[in-house]
Structure formats: structure tokens, C-alpha cells
A protein has these predicted regions:
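Alpha-helix C-capping/helix-to-loop hinge sites
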Residues: 13, 31-34, 51, 55, ...
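Short, well-structured N-terminal submotif of metal-dependent ribonuclease cores
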Residues: 1-40, 55-68, 132
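Active-site neighborhoods of divalent-metal-dependent phosphate/nucleic-acid chemistry enzymes
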Residues: 79-125
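Short beta-strand segments at enzyme active-site cores
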Residues: 39-42, 124
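Alpha-helix/helix-capping structural signal
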Residues: 8-9, 43, 109, 128
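Glycine/small-residue-rich phosphate/adenosyl-binding loop
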Residues: 45, 58-75, 79
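Acidic, PIN/NYN-like endoribonuclease modules and their adjacent C-terminal/linker elements
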Residues: 2, 108-145
């Protein structure tokens, strides 16, 4: 199955003490084992690195560890989806026309990458946020791990 992972799924999969680790880790492991075909947005690489290195409460990891987690778990097994300049502009124009603002802008860009990947499942911890940005047909493909 083709699966797209939001950044928050990757972060949860990498950190054993994350509250969603036990549901997120199998998603990444299935991709690494070749059981599923995995996709992530290019933006998620930088976002995962930033989150991993700045987690509150002493839970952050060293920059070299963050890079190792991304390199070994994502770059070796997942296809990286990039939006073209035209796709980026179209997505932002649609967001503006629909009144999408603030942090939801990143959700709409990640969702556009998920759609571009052709994934049958779009995994996110923000199911409601993603589902509120799209039509009924796509909503059925958006789920938590």
C-alpha cells in the first residue's frame, strides 16, 4: 500500500517516550521492510529535524542523532515528495481563497504533497485538521496510525 506520513508521525516513530510511538513506529517499520511504499514531504525532513532538536522538557536529541534518525529511517526507505513552484503557488492561492491561515498553511502544503504522492493512506496525528482541509473523498484516506 502507498502511505504518506505527516511529520508528527515520523517524530512519534523515532522517539520511544512519545505517547504515540507504539502506533507510529509500525508504519515506518512496514515501509522500511518493503511491505508498504512510503512517502514524505520534503518539508517534513527539515521540520522533523527542527522538532527533534528542540523538544521541550529535555527530550530533544543532538543534531547528529536527529540527522541519523532521518537518514536511516526516512531517506533510505521513503520517497521524498516536492511540490513544484506552480503547485506551491496553486496550493497557497487555494488556501488564501478558503481563508486558511497560520499553522494550517503547513497542513495544507503537507496534504498537497500527500495527494501528489498518490498515497492510499495519509497518516497524521492531526486527523481532524487535515480532514477539515479537503473533500469527502480524500477525508476517507486520512487517518491516525
Amino acid at each position: 500500500m502507498k502511505v504518506f506520513c505527516d511529520t508528527n508521525v515520523l517524530v512519534a516513530a523515532f522517539l520511544q517516550n512519545h505517547p504515540h510511538h507504539h502506533s507510529a513506529r509500525p508504519v515506518v517499520e512496514r515501509v522500511k521492510a518493503g511491505q508498504d511504499q512510503g512517502f514524505v514531504a520534503a518539508h517534513s525532513l527539515a521540520e522533523a529535524y527542527a522538532v527533534l532538536t528542540r523538544l521541550p522538557g529535555g527530550n530533544q536529541v543532538a543534531p547528529t542523532v536527529a540527522w541519523q534518525l532521518i537518514s536511516e529511517n526516512v531517506l533510505r526507505s521513503f520517497s521524498i515528495i516536492t511540490l513544484t513552484a506552480k503547485e506551491y503557488a496553486q496550493t497557497l492561492e487555494k488556501a488564501a481563497n478558503e481563508g486558511i491561515e497560520g499553522g494550517r498553511t503547513y497542513d495544507v502544503l503537507l496534504l498537497a504533497s500527500g495527494v501528489k504522492s498518490g498515497a492510499e493512506r495519509i497518516y497524521t496525528m492531526n486527523v481532524r485538521h487535515f480532514q477539515n482541509l479537503t473533500d469527502e473523498k480524500l477525508r476517507a484516506r486520512i487517518t491516525a496510525p
